[in-house]
């Protein structure tokens, strides 16, 4: 596991959790102050847990942004993580079973293998691109180079 720290404000912006880091004991990867939580556990055959519901709670969205996680199911990607000032902090190849979590800051990825499968989880509600995203203007952005 690796935390990617802002050079601007010193906070954890992104966390990479590698499939190789899964252990038999549950690991709570993301601090409980965040709206998006992530834990990992290596499980035994026939293992179970007590059936349950979750208790409703009020969540204050005024002090946070959308948080998002990508889980690589098959294949690989090159993840790029940005600081709060839009500068690149990290570029990294993620493979099957690896997870990228963005708590704050920007991100993008490039698919490296045909038929890659990625699951994306994020806090909601998603209200469409105009109300959800601010695009980073970066001279290395391939979307800007094609215009």
Predicted features along the sequence, with ranges:
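Hydrophobic/aromatic beta-strand elements that line small-molecule binding cavities or substrate pockets
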Residues: 41, 69-70, 106-107
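Short beta-strand His + acidic residue motifs that chelate non-heme Fe in jelly-roll/DSBH
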Residues: 51, 79-80, 101-102, 107-112, ...
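Double-stranded beta-helix
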Residues: 108-147
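Glycine- and acidic-residue-biased ligand/ion/polar-headgroup-sensing regions
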Residues: 44-45, 64-82
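Conserved short histidine dyad/triad with adjacent acidic residue
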Residues: 41-64
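A short, N-terminal "cap"/entry segment at the start of jelly-roll beta-barrel domains
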Residues: 1-44, 92, 145-147
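Short acidic-glycine-tyrosine-enriched beta hairpin
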Residues: 83-104
């Amino acid at each position: 596991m690796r935390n990617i720290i802002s050079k601007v404000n010193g906070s954890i912006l992104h966390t990479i959790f590698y499939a190789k880091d899964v252990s038999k004991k549950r690991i709570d990867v993301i601090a409980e102050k965040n709206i998006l939580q992530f834990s990992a556990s290596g499980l035994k055959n026939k293992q179970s847990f007590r059936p349950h519901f979750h208790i409703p709670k009020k969540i204050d969205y005024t002090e946070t942004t959308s948080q998002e996680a990508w889980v690589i199911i098959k294949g690989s990607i090159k993840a790029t993580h940005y600081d709060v000032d839009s500068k690149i902090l990290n570029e990294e190849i993620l493979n099957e079973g690896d997870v990228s979590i963005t708590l704050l800051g920007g991100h993008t990825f490039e698919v490296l293998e045909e038929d890659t499968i990625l699951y994306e989880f994020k806090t909601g509600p998603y209200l469409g691109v105009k109300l959800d995203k601010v695009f980073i203007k970066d001279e290395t952005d391939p979307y800007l180079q094609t215009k």
